[in-house]
Amino acid sequence: MTEISYNDLSSTAPINLMVFAGAFNWPVWVAQDRGLFARDGLTVNVTETPGSVVQWTSLAEGRSDIVITLMDNVVAYREGQGEAPVTVSDAIAVMASDALLMPALMTQPDIKSYDDLRGQTLSVDAALTGLALILYALLEKGGLKPGDYQIVRTGGVLGRFEGLKRHEFAGALFNTPFSTQLEELGYRSLDTAASVMQHYQGHVVATRAGWAQENSRALQGFLRALSDAIDWLYDPTNKADAFAIFRDHMPASDDKAAGIAYSVLFDPKAGFARNGAVDIDGIAKVLELRSKFGQPAKRLGQPSRYFDPSYLETALRGSR
């Protein structure tokens, strides 16, 4: 693959990026607001999705070029197991974009055990993809089987976050910093994915292999900007400016919310993966869960089928 040149990206068509709403977009906000995308001649149009069905339909139809999404969605939609009736046969992950902390099963305060979830309703973004598969594994570990509970589709994490606060359901899985914020509000962390797995690859930057090949320099520039934004966020001398960017993009939040988000997303040991490093064992766990719970059942490939590290490797060589 040709190593990236940062002198001739000004004619590149805008990149259409679709993300879930939330503080985990902080590196995207930094790359946008501090000119890291523009530095390399990139224009990035960011759209927030209400859920994975909209996101993957958009990617399949070519309205989105890049998505930040759960690794499980990459596998599901490549293999025809997604919630939406679309297949993205060349879907690939190209970079990790998530903290290393495991998702937590957050419940109403009166739910004190798995047995208390019998007959209750639990919320997911989509019933066949994403964190839903971890939820099923946790419920099975807790002695519950399908039929002991109901599943309702609420869409992306903001919908689940607000729905739990409105008491629309008994519980749902949340990544950081939403799980931490809910604990601060008095909701119960009943369990975490760490009780059923040691590794799990969460959010990744994903695209279509065909688009990546045709737009390799633009993709490399995008990944370089995102990696540089993560490095900038880890630098404690930038915290005041980082909080200002947070408030600009989440105007309903205050410095306390920013502090909570920062403490978990950029924790030196469990925060965002440096250099976008993907956890291959984490992808293997995604495949294990999908082999067990995915529909229709099918034989899945090795982690390398769903992750191409070459674009990130080239981008990082160009930035050193």
List each language-model region with its residue ranges.
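Short, glycine-/small- and polar/acidic-enriched structural segments
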Residues: T2-G147, I151-G155, R160-G163, A170-T176
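Secondary-structure end/capping motifs
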Residues: Q213-A297
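Conserved C-terminal helix/tail region of periplasmic/extracytoplasmic solute-binding proteins
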Residues: A284-R320
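Short polybasic/polar patches that bind polyanions
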Residues: D33, A38, E140, E183, ...
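Short, solvent-exposed loop/beta-turn-alpha elements that line the ligand-binding surface or hinge
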Residues: R39, P85-V86, S195-Q198, K269-D279
